């Protein structure tokens, strides 16, 4: 899978990425489903999601930012912020 260099973020592609990592149907990954509570994500799966996000979107996620990766919406907002940051 080629590394994405565009700053455009498609929520449905993000949903597919998360569903793929978690081996779930895309429909199960709703915007507000809590990854740990609703989708049974453990720490290893959370790390795998983080690694895939960094590779796919070409961003580095600081440890403090990982608390935002609790739902698709939170992840989307974090990535939108990171991709819009031109520093």
UniProtKB/Swiss-Prot annotation:
The keyword Phosphoprotein applies. GO terms for biological process: antibiotic biosynthetic process; secondary metabolite biosynthetic process. 4'-phosphopantetheine is transferred from CoA to a specific serine of the apo-ACP-like protein. Residues 8-83 form the Carrier domain. Gene3D superfamilies: ACP-like (1.10.1200.10). Keywords: Phosphopantetheine, Phosphoprotein. It comes from the Bacteria. SUPFAM superfamilies: ACP-like. InterPro entries: ACP-like_sf, PKS_PP-bd, PP-bd_ACP. One of its GO terms (molecular function) is phosphopantetheine binding. Acyl carrier protein. This is Polyketide-8 synthase acyl carrier protein 2. It comes from Streptomyces avermitilis (strain ATCC 31267 / DSM 46492 / JCM 5070 / NBRC 14893 / NCIMB 12804 / NRRL 8165 / MA-4680).
């Amino acid at each position: 899978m080629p590394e994405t260099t565009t700053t455009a973020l498609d929520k449905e592609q993000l949903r597919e990425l998360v569903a793929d990592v978690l081996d779930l149907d895309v429909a199960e990954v709703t915007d507000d489903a809590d990854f740990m509570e609703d989708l049974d994500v453990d720490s290893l799966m959370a790390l795998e999601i983080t690694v895939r996000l960094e590779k796919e979107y070409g961003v580095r996620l600081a440890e403090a930012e990982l608390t935002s990766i609790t739902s698709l919406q939170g992840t989307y907002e974090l990535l939108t912020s990171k991709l819009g940051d031109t520093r």
